[in-house]
Amino acid sequence: MKNKRALVLLFAAHMISSFAQGITMLAIPWYFTSVVNQSELFGKVLALATVLSVFWSLYAGTLIDRYPRKNIFWFTALAGLLCMGSIAAYGSQSDQMPIALVALAFVVTFFGYNIHYPNLYAFAQELAARGDYGRVNSMIEVVGQSTSVLSGAVGAILLSGTTTGGINLMGMHVKLPFEIAQWQLWEIFMLDASTYLAAACIIPFIRYQRMAELKVDLEPIFARLKKGVRFLTANRGLLMFGLASYATFIVLLVQVMYLLPLYIDRQLLSGADVYASSEVYFALGSLCAGLFIRSLTKHMAPAKAIVILMIGAGVLFLAVSSVKSVSFFYVFSLLLGFSNAGTRIIRVTYLFDHIPNNIIGRANSIFYLYNILMRSVLLSVFSLAFFSFENNVVWAYAICGMFILAALIPMVRIMPRLKGMQVVEVE
């Protein structure tokens, strides 16, 4: 594989910065739900951030196709360092963390995700040969989910501490020969800032050779965005595939960022250890998908494999809405991780094979716009007081399951059109 060293450094920078990001995105929803008991407020913050990201994600897509992806990684790392470092410094000096600053930290990280992951995939496509796309996407999943396993385990320790001589992790009590005090939010934010710094130090050393000529559009932003729209409308089968196959990921983001802490607190009546442990199980399932999904589905059409995985995800959400069991929730998290990651690997590989690298950023922005709009609708509904009352969050899980199963209708309809699809180029 060419550009191997560049890919290793790219994955290293991604892994380091994602580690503390994962802990931050565990800590903030739990803080709103179980520490300050403001789950409805967090729902509104998340909904607002989601709506604002409509404009940001579209703009980010044009940036990814206009400027060197390496430079974008470096500048986003510096921005994360500055923002999270400043918030952490305020918390350290004042020994308090206002809710407004906690919300700001969440929005900064959330907006960072909106450019980090599309840029990561576009850069990986730029570095890899066409025949290596599936392998590289699997590597991204393995690296990302290995990091999630680690950040989930560390997050369980930092969020709850080890004052009982150990930590409850993945349903087991792990004894430790030392005590770790529960971390304050500003300390977690400072850890996050330090990993942004480490990533910013690694990125300049990435040296690579483009695997294909990258034609950069120098037109104004709206003209570049319109070209992405024209490409997808000229390839409607590809457009429908990209939208329908996003269903599991849409629901997953709503679940992880909003419903998960509510479900654990109100339905399972459990604490931060179960919250973080469920993330570890999810990451383990995703890691298994990264390792094995290509071999399991190599003789299967991409759309058919995704349909099977989506059916599994939809059934899982319906099942967990009616079963009150921590053990079953761990099984749910494990299998959902496998389904989501498997779908993402197959989906992204198919899109890499059919969308030119010089337009992938804008195409992904359009797909992500649909993602944002659907999440906004779901979050607007789930932030109603009804879903945070007692254990009514189970109804939200049932709705999520039905949303995924409904997305199967367009997926099944376009399956015949995806075989041997010829891409229509646009000027």
Regions found by a protein language model. Give the residues of each.
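C-terminal transmembrane helical hairpin of 12-TM major facilitator-type secondary transporters
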Residues: A303-T343
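Transmembrane alpha-helix termini and helix-breaking/packing motifs in multi-pass membrane transporters
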Residues: P29-S34, A88, S92-Q93, L150-F189, ...
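Juxtamembrane intracellular "pre-TM" segments in multi-pass secondary transporters
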Residues: M1-L7, Y208-L243
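A single, central transmembrane helix in multi-pass transporters
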Residues: G166-K175, Q184-L185, R230-G290
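Helix-loop junctions on the cytosolic side of multi-pass membrane transporters
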Residues: A122, E126, A181-L185, F189-E219, ...
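Substrate-agnostic recognition of the 12-TM MFS/MFS-like secondary transporter fold
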Residues: L9-M25, L46-I64, P68-G80, A100-T162, ...
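Cytoplasmic membrane-interface "Motif A"-like loop-to-helix N-cap segments
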Residues: R66-G80, T297-M310, N392
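C-terminal ends and interior cores of transmembrane alpha-helices
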Residues: L78-D95, I311-K324
